[in-house]
Amino acid sequence: AQGLPVRFELMDYRQFNPDGKLRFDRVASIGMFEHVGHKNYRQWFGMVRRSVHEDGLCLLHTIGKNRSGTGIDPWIDKYIFPNGVLPSAAELAASAEDFVIEDWHNFGADYDRTLMAWHARFEAAWPRLKHQYDERFYRMWRYYLLCCAGTFRARDNQLWQLVLSPRGQPGGYRRPLL
């Protein structure tokens, strides 16, 4: 970001912009919402709401699950994402009531292929890496990638990308064509 009008801040989102004095055209959250916890969803959406301009947009990119009230896998909780929580569609929608959901895209089926590609690359790189890591790490990382791929292949987990606006985009939101 050198030379760009960008500023990075490392902080707890709950301490960001408490008085709402800062306003942004766009807010993006990628791979973070899984660590918010369902008890804090409304607080997170409140922080975004007071931080985005009335005509601004928020991009929320998160892994989610199909059913509310189910916990995270104990192994994932212990070794990969301690205290991680996957939101359900119902939990997201209920918590985002102060926004218009302009777009909700599901990349879940694609994420299975992504995880399998990561697994293939990990296997191919392992001969170069095995001197830096032990056999336990190898087994755990394979287990993580393959189990996660299985949850997406079974369509139990999803990868969602939501575009939210405070008041709705005049004429409706149009996703940019790639």
What do these predicted regions represent?
Residues 5-8, 58:
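Hydrophobic/aromatic anchor residues within beta-strands of the central parallel beta-sheet
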Residues 7-11, 102-105:
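General small-molecule cofactor/ligand-binding pocket signal
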Residues 11-27:
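A short acidic, Gly/Pro-enriched loop at the edge of an enzyme's catalytic core
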Residues 12-14, 62-65:
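Short glycine-enriched loops at secondary-structure junctions
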Residues 28-33:
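A conserved beta-strand element that flanks and buttresses the S-adenosyl-L-methionine
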Residues 35-42:
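Active-site glycine- and acidic-residue-rich loops that bind
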Residues 42-57:
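A short glycine-rich, Lys/Arg-flanked "PGG" loop and its adjoining helix->strand segment in the class I
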Residues 63-171, 178:
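Substrate-binding/catalytic lobe of Class I Rossmann-like enzymes that use SAM or dcSAM, i.e.
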